[in-house]
Amino acid sequence: MAQIFNFSSGPAMLPAEVLEQAQQELRDWNGLGTSVMEVSHRGKEFIQVAEEAEKDFRDLLNVPSNYKVLFCHGGGRGQFAAVPLNILGDKTTADYVDAGYWAASAIKEAKKYCTPNVFDAKVTVDGLRAVKPMSEWQLSDNAAYMHYCPNETIDGIAIDETPDFGKDVVVAADFSSTILSRPIDVSRYGVIYAGAQKNIGPAGLTIVIVREDLLGKANIACPSILDYSILNDNDSMFNTPPTFAWYLSGLVFKWLKANGGVAAMDKINQQKAELLYGVIDNSDFYRNDVAKANRSRMNVPFQLADSALDKLFLEESFAAGLHALKGHRVVGGMRASIYNAMPLEGVKALTDFMVEFERRHG
């Protein structure tokens, strides 16, 4: 079968080695004669999977011992509600930084539970979309926490700065599309959450990293399945977890460790982004409208000089084995999502196609 490179924003491409192992084990996992999807989540075999997955995840991100790691349902949108329900305590407001679509979605959900103090960080610099630096973010004195999204998949905007607002500011962040792609200092955050379907594994699993002193503050109306304390007390098994997603994510963690960990991913992701943005910047046929300081390394939106060629570009790229390049309806054009599992070879195939397409149609 011809090599297919999947540039989907999520569910996203998974490492070929991981898929091959899962395929081999699908009907006879661990010598049990059954699939991992069929075994009890409370059986010793799956407990081992769960424990190894958490340990490997902690190792990859150097998660400090005073942080809990939870494997949850509900996706990022579930956490839009879970964060205020768990962290507000007796306060009624929280700071929210708006830098794009997903930050705005979190703000909309938070309004059900508190009065968000919204800081619009979006700005235009030399005609390009950008984000104000953290030094200019205006935070309130009475907020329970500050929330932001480090990587906006739709807008192709990244905030790579490390938060430094002082020890009294609880920082909550949606790392769904950038987790494990580069080193992060977990100790600078109160809550980190990430849907699995981009850099972790298949859809259906969400990972939460929460500082232990923030547990035990959940609103009385918080659903039990979103209560961090309950999930922690039950080892993320308050109800039946998404076991297959948990298992497959564990395989991804082992793949990451075998390939040099997050530091190695950071380097290769930089190479991939530089290659793709280089073709865009050295062309009058393609353009990206994000300021270089805020360009995402995970999600690269770009437009053609003549939008009438969009349909042909998508048809020909698909035929060439370059799939899921259509941009989000909000932005249009094209978008290449190049998460950890996308090899440099895939980005090279895309850039070669782009150069050839421009030669024929530019």
UniProtKB/Swiss-Prot annotation:
Pyridoxal 5'-phosphate binds at residues 76-77, 102, 153, 174, 197, 239-240. Its EC number is 2.6.1.52. Coiled coil: none annotated. Keywords: Amino-acid biosynthesis, Aminotransferase, Cytoplasm, Pyridoxal phosphate, Pyridoxine biosynthesis, Serine biosynthesis, Transferase. It is found in: Cytoplasm. Its cofactor is pyridoxal 5'-phosphate. The modification N6-(pyridoxal phosphate)lysine is found at residue 198. InterPro entries: Aminotrans_V_dom, Aminotrans_V_PyrdxlP_BS, Pser_aminoTfrase, PyrdxlP-dep_Trfase, PyrdxlP-dep_Trfase_major, PyrdxlP-dep_Trfase_small. GO terms for biological process: L-serine biosynthetic process; pyridoxine biosynthetic process. Pathway: Amino-acid biosynthesis; L-serine biosynthesis; L-serine from 3-phospho-D-glycerate: step 2/3; Cofactor biosynthesis; pyridoxine 5'-phosphate biosynthesis; pyridoxine 5'-phosphate from D-erythrose 4-phosphate: step 3/5. Homodimer. Catalyzes the reversible conversion of 3-phosphohydroxypyruvate to phosphoserine and of 3-hydroxy-2-oxo-4-phosphonooxybutanoate to phosphohydroxythreonine. This is Phosphoserine aminotransferase. It comes from Escherichia coli O1:K1 / APEC. The lineage of its organism: Bacteria, Pseudomonadati, Pseudomonadota, Gammaproteobacteria, Enterobacterales. The gene is serC.
